[in-house]
Amino acid sequence: MPSKLAIFGCGSDLSTNIEKLKKEFEIVGVFDNNSELHGKEKHGFKISNPEKILTFNFETLKICSLANTTKIRAQVIDLGVPEEKIIPTPLWCDRNLAKWTKLRNERNRERVFIIGNGPSLTLEDLNLLHLNNEACFAFNKIYLAFEESDFRPTYYMVEDTLVAKNNARKIDALHGFPKFYPEHLLRTLMMSNDVLIFGQNLPNANYEMATEPSSEPTDFGWGSTVTCTAIQAAIYLGFSKIHLLGVDFNFEWSGEKVSEKNVLIGQGETNHFHKDYRPAGEKWNAPKMDITESHYILLQEFAARIGVEIINSTRGGKLEVFPRVSLEQALA
């Protein structure tokens, strides 16, 4: 007889998995935090208030969400659901957590460079970091430099949904270094042995504010840019000195077409280090500079409390939250 299953979350992840779950389990209840859904049906199941979860007889609970699973997991445990009843999400599975621990234990340097893709970044900079054998985080379309440089990142990260969708095949083809993705990108990018999943403490549905930084990969704070997430990952890994390079913090998108709220259509913007970075017609998310700046301030305060230095080694740009030291001075 199939075991009795409770499901938390009734969004797109449930729609994707419901038929498979029906075959494998006896579904006894579906729960969601959206009070407007309570009492309504989805996929033939009545949606209930999570506060009533212990009134249902179930053996296991599955979180059907690829966002804020850390919050949901903590919520159901607080409601009295035994931890051992919760089916681990990709973020919380033992294998993923072990990968994070292994990387932290393998770190053998105190300094790391976090490389933004701003126009100030040059191939000469990347080659210099390569020749100096520096630990580096890089992001998104950094692979555009690979044909012209021997530089390869120590760690690669992507978190933006449109970046992942637009470049999934190229990102999936990247190998030779760990790749960090948030849980929600598992809908878009392939899982492989070199992929590590991180969780994010996302704000309200409109993404109107930054969230508190964390050094735990299950619950990184959100600052509307992958750079903020990488700083937190670097802190988790144990780096005590973090240099930013190519983080110009100076976007211009007045010439772009607006597709929908906060989504632009590329018309030749030149905010990045490579001429082919933004092909015409590509959709991209407009930066939320005020949110990012507020998160940089939170990160500076967070890092100072735990004895970590964040230094801006970008050539020029408009980011003045962190003290500046030139790349040449840093490598001298």
Spell out what each predicted region is.
Residues 35-95:
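Phosphate-bearing ligand-interacting subdomains
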Residues 71-332:
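Metal-ion/cofactor- or nucleotide/acyl-coenzyme-handling active-site neighborhoods
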Residues 2-21, 30, 116:
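Glycine-rich adenosine-cofactor-binding loop
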Residues 25-27, 153:
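Core-facing hydrophobic residues within beta-strands of well-ordered domains
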Residues 28-35, 137-141:
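A short beta-strand-loop structural module common to alpha/beta enzyme folds
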Residues 1-6, 52-54, 234:
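Hydrophobic, helix-prone linear segments
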